[in-house]
């Protein structure tokens, strides 16, 4: 699967705003063409799980309507998203993996799943903690969340790679402790280097660390439905067609999918 980020088909102006949800007609026409040719999944950034004590039900219902309209096979969203003073500013911060957050997320995820009417996959974000203990804490947290709610996981391998490079977190230990049967989608992407670390922008070639993680984990994910190549819309003109195809074929060979004809 290819994912172009950001891909916005509607805008949420926030709670209490008149005509809160604004649709983009030109983008709707494009997604309708795609829906006639491909199986689709919805990837959201607006539910802001964990950002407050209450789920934004209106936003979840709007997302559900879109998923139903285009027959999306599942809906994915990011975890965690700490929001202070803004409804959907999911990059405002990162939450701690503790019982309070687990309780909040369990309630929100269960409500969201009832509204969405489609399987819900939750994506790992770059962690805010440091050190070896984080891997064990986070894997136990995610296992508890999936077992309690029945939701599944979208494992972003570049975010996991960022944890290793920027935070000193043992990605291998996280994988070894995690229930891999909960993983139904994997994201692979790239990022920018900066002094002392990397940032998650998906702009350049995939780092070898991402490929190593994919090779290590994909064959062990018995319920994996797809691997998604994530790239930003800002790079549309800069993408090298042959290089993209080469990366896709490398991913196919690791996952065990037959090589496509071009």
Model regions: which residues?
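C-terminal helical cap(s) of enzyme catalytic domains, especially alpha/beta-barrels
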Residues: 238-261
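Acidic-and-aromatic substrate-binding clefts and catalytic sites of carbohydrate-active enzymes
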Residues: 6-26, 48-58, 128-136, 161-168, ...
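Active-site acidic/histidine proton-transfer and metal-coordination neighborhood
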Residues: 55-153
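Gly/Pro-rich active-site loop or hairpin
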Residues: 12-25, 93-102, 163-223, 238
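Short, small-residue-biased leader/transition segments that mark boundaries at the very start
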Residues: 1-2
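Acidic (Asp/Glu)-rich catalytic clusters
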Residues: 22-42, 58-73, 110-115, 144-148, ...
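Active-site beta-loop-alpha junctions enriched in small/polar residues
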Residues: 5-8, 45-48, 79-80, 125-127, ...
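Structural preference for beta-strand elements that scaffold enzyme active sites
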Residues: 37-41, 72-76, 119-123, 152-154, ...
